[in-house]
Amino acid sequence: MIKLRKWSDSSDVDVAVLAEELEQLLLAVYEVSPWTADQVAEVLRSDVNSCALAEDKSRLVGFLVWQETDFEAEVLQIAVKKAYQGQGIASALFAQLPTDKEIFLEVRKSNQRAQAFYKKEKMVVIAERKAYYHDPVEDAIIMKREKDEG
């Protein structure tokens, strides 16, 4: 059974250990991690960032990291292990986002599957950023969900 929990510095898992796990999950899902373990640790230590974890028998199978301000939140990263995709885990993680704030995210223009998922989560395309991603260089689609639509 999949369990969701919000991670915090006071959790029983050390930041460096969790950062390494998240980097490995990103590598497994995307084949190239957009973040190093050090970058993940830095993101986790920031007071403006939050992290929700999806676990199966205490094994990490997915996560969502977002940054929050007074009026909006931005999805920084979401990933679910391939063997667990299509089981509603990403939607359950997305449900952890605040509903009283606008939500923003960027997604690769070629990632049609992710865009379809985000649209299902009431995100709409609002803009495009040229050459936002590297390795390979690619445009980003910027999406937004209005507050109280989550």
Say what each PLM segment does.
Residues 3, 7, 108-112, 131-150:
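C-terminal "cap" of GNAT-fold acetyltransferases
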Residues 75, 103-107:
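Conserved hydrophobic beta-strand within the GNAT/NAT acetyltransferase core sheet
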Residues 80-99, 112-120:
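Conserved acetyl-CoA-binding loop-helix of GNAT-fold acetyltransferases
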Residues 118, 123, 143:
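Conserved active-site tyrosine of GNAT-family acetyltransferases
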